């Protein structure tokens, strides 16, 4: 039995969002095809994720020195630890995001910061940093109104590229994507683009 974290980062549901529609199709098909697996949904817009700020950095320093943390420091550090441990407990991750300003919503970066922890998801060695998530799988589903996979705008895409880079850094050996793009550039193709993405999601769900 595998544990899957279904991590969504969109303020709207599948009736409005193409990425959420594809994500819903994927996870429903996945659950039908893998009924023995556990699926946990994390809505990043409804989840408290402390940003790494003065309290967090000071709290981590105090923990290393065996010092007492303030209430705010303890609350934030404990919450980040809970997020990390939940992440580590899973075998597979499905991240659903829109493209915002060439990247993704800021809640995604906050989540990545929470789980990118030395000694937990990567380590430093004489050969340099080494990822520790060597038995995990990641799927990223992202919608983009324009075309960024190929063409003149390809170099501007920094959302999926960043996620692929950080997951590789953390040692993840399997990273797949479902990209939904062009529905704003060519509105007359919106339904076709959406239907294709849902079909792709359902197909991948059987083997992921």
UniProtKB/Swiss-Prot annotation:
Cofactor: FMN
InterPro entries xrefs: Flavodoxin_fold, Flavoprotein-like_sf, FMN-dep_NADH:Q_OxRdtase_AzoR1, NADH:quinone_OxRdtase_FMN_depd
Gene: azoR
UniProt GO molecular function: electron transfer activity; FMN binding; oxidoreductase activity, acting on NAD(P)H as acceptor; oxidoreductase activity, acting on NAD(P)H, quinone or similar compound as acceptor
Any single Pfam family the record assigns to this protein: Flavodoxin_2
Catalytic reaction list: 2 a quinone + NADH + H(+) = 2 a 1,4-benzosemiquinone + NAD(+); N,N-dimethyl-1,4-phenylenediamine + anthranilate + 2 NAD(+) = 2-(4-dimethylaminophenyl)diazenylbenzoate + 2 NADH + 2 H(+)
Binding site for FMN: 17-19, 99-102, 143-146
SUPFAM superfamilies recorded: Flavoproteins (SSF52218)
UniProt-listed HAMAP family: Azoreductase_type1
Keyword field: Flavoprotein, FMN, NAD, Oxidoreductase
NCBIfam families reported in the protein's UniProt record: PRK13556.1
Protein name in UniProt: FMN-dependent NADH:quinone oxidoreductase
UniProt superkingdom: Bacteria
Function, as annotated: Quinone reductase that provides resistance to thiol-specific stress caused by electrophilic quinones. Also exhibits azoreductase activity. Catalyzes the reductive cleavage of the azo bond in aromatic azo compounds to the corresponding amines.
Entry similarity comment: Belongs to the azoreductase type 1 family.
Cofactor note as given: Binds 1 FMN per subunit.
Enzyme Commission code: 1.6.5.-, 1.7.1.17
Coiled coil: none
Assembly mode: Homodimer.
The species this protein was found in: Staphylococcus aureus (strain MRSA252)
């Amino acid at each position: 039995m595998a544990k899957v974290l279904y991590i969504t980062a969109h303020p709207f549901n599948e009736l409005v969002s193409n990425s959420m529609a594809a994500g819903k199709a994927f996870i429903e098909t996945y659950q039908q095809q893998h009924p023995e697996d556990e699926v946990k949904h994390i809505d990043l817009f409804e989840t408290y994720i402390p940003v790494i700020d003065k309290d967090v950095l000071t709290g981590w320093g105090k923990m290393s020195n065996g010092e007492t943390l303030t209430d705010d420091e303890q609350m934030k550090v404990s919450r980040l630890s809970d997020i990390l441990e939940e992440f580590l407990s899973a075998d597979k991750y499905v991240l659903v995001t829109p493209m915002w300003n060439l990247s993704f919503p800021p809640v995604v970066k906050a989540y990545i910061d929470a789980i990118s922890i030395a000694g937990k998801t990567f380590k430093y060695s004489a050969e340099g940093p080494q990822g520790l998530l060597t038995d995990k799988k990641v799927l990223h589903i992202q919608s983009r109104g324009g075309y960024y996979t190929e063409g003149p705008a390809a170099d501007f895409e920094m959302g999926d590229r960043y996620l692929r880079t950080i997951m590789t850094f953390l040692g993840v050996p399997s990273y797949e994507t479902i990209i939904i793009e062009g529905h704003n550039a060519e509105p007359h193709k919106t339904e076709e683009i959406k239907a294709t993405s849902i079909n792709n999601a359902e197909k991948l769900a059987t083997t992921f």
